[in-house]
Amino acid sequence: MSVSASIISINESAGALTNIQDGQVFEYVLLDPSPESKERLKNIVQEFLKKINLEKSYNLLCLCLEEIISNSVKANIKRAYFISHNLDINKPEDYEKGMKSFKEEGLSKIKDMRFVKKIADMGLYVKLYFTIQNGCLTSTAKNNSVISKEEIDRVNTKLKLSENKSAEDLFMNSIDQTEGAGLGIIMIKKILSQISSAPDCFAISATDTETVTELKILP
């Protein structure tokens, strides 16, 4: 996604998707993880897939994006949880202490709209960007709970070790138990490999301020 491209807000313009052009960048800010927001996202995905004549991949791409959004929302909840408990997520001793209680208590807050509002008040966000260039749909998710280098290394290790494994093998033999088996990310990559001919169909990285997950769909 070109950083110099002007960004069109889908949130602010009801008719933003009526005439999608090559190279345009569209932004959708996920205000909350409500069913209404998810339904809006599905409609957005449908419009972009129509543009590249790949409507048949609608359900699978929605599944991938929902998993990525879920991961982003959970990351924001985790960060907000640590902040509200005066714990530094980057300090090993605080991280270990915080994760013990977070796994039991923190994720239950995902449906607590008061906590969701608190997350927004802290300035934490999930933003989605969509652009089509030369027939390739790029969907980029950004959230400002920055993934650590260690976590990125774990994700890439999981992806590497999952190559040439069947879905059954992946579920029967989890690769890394750190904060879950990471099967969601692995399945996203496998799904994208089936519906996209782009060699770099999935990537996750981090800047100093954001975690960036990119999906490329090329018929």
Which residue stretches match the model-derived regions?
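Short C-terminal beta-strand
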Residues: 208-219
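Bergerat-fold GHKL ATPase/HATPase_c domain
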Residues: 1-122, 153
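A short beta-strand-to-loop motif within the catalytic HATPase_c
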Residues: 79, 201-208
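Short, well-structured alpha-helical interface segments that form or flank functional binding sites
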Residues: 56-67, 136, 180-187
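Glycine-rich/acidic phosphate-handling loop/turn and adjacent ATP-lid/helix
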Residues: 82-181
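Conserved glycine-/histidine-rich ATP-lid loop and adjacent helix of the Bergerat-fold HATPase_c
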Residues: 185-201
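Short beta-strand element(s) in the Bergerat
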Residues: 22-27, 126, 135-139, 211-213
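Conserved catalytic-core segments centered on acid/base and nucleophilic motifs
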Residues: 61-64, 72, 126-132, 139, ...
